[in-house]
Structures are given as C-alpha cells and as structure tokens.
Amino acid sequence: WNVYTDDVKDSVASYGDAAIVVLSRIGGEGADLDFKETNYLALDDNEKEMLQNVAEMKKAGQVKKIVVLINSANTLQVDFLKNNEYDVDACMWIGDVGISGINAVAEILAGNVTPSGSLVDTYLYDNFSAPAMMNFVPTVYEGYEEGIIPEHAKTYMIYQEGIYVGYKYYETRYEDYVMQSGNSGAYEYHDDVAYPFGYGMSYTDFKY
C-alpha cells in the first residue's frame, strides 16, 4: 500500500463510487507458474494490505463498493472473497485480456453490457486441497546436463491422478460421497469449493 502515491489514493476517494482492485498472475503455455515456497495463486502480503486499506476507505465512506478483477489465466485461491475484513462486493474473472479486451471489461463495469459467461474452472478456498498438488514439483530429467538443454526444459511433472485434476476431482469426489461409492468416506464439498465449474452471475435475472 505504501508504494502508491497520495495522488493515487486520493483519486479513488475523490471518485467515491467503486474501487477497482486488479489482481494479476502470469502463467500459461510455455510459461509455468512461479515455484515459490508460498502459494503463488494466493494473495501475498502486499495484496492483503492493499485490500485492507481499500476496505478502510469503504468503511469511512470514501468509496461505496469494492470490485475485484482477476487478471489471470490460472485460478487464484479466492478465500479472500469470503473474508469480511476485505468486504469485497463483487469479483469478475477477466482472464488474459490482450490488447483490446480491457475495453470490454470497461463496458461491463460501466453497465453498458451484461456479463453472461460461466466459469470454466473451479475456484477454491485452498488450492492445496487438491491431491494433484502433492505431485506439483519440478522433477529434473535424468542425465540432464547444464548448458546443453535450456533451463526451462530440464524438468517435468507426473500426473498420477489421471483425469481427476481440477474440477473433475472435486465433482467426482462429491458424487462418490453422495452415492456412497467404494470407500468414499465423509466429504464436505463446500468446504473446498468456493465457486464451482459453470458458476456465473449476471446483471439480469432470467425466467424460463
């Protein structure tokens, strides 16, 4: 929060309507996520501090709403959306917007068009609740020689879970519990899943 100048902070307060908070992560084809000791897809301390300060501005009446935009092709851990300390009113996944996609985001925020898409991934309270995370480590190829193979091409991963990665695991795990298949045991779906695959809201209510 300290990296922002007073002019930036004052501009939010003088606007007074909605504070737009953008959370970004980098990762995709040919550029895997950062292997940190912490959870790269969770909020870091700087982001938490920023949301806390914006929430204080809202509490003081300087802004009316807090809207979070998730600028990432990967699924952030969204436990913060249910944290009253941050008091977030709305969140929209915008993916990697490219050169002109941000114009469409502005149209949505202004209410000129209505968002009607549904999530293509499952968003979790804790990304490490997935069994696949147990194998998410960079394994170096046997016989790898420094200077021969590019650094980014020296490692691989093993998917021991087969198809049960991401939403396929959570949906199947829950179905096994409901149907009492095998040794499924107890399972609380909503303790893991914040927003399921296919979830989506709009400015409009539809009747069928």
Regions found by a protein language model. Give the residues of each.
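C-terminal non-catalytic regions of proteins with extracellular/luminal or membrane-system context
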Residues: 1-207
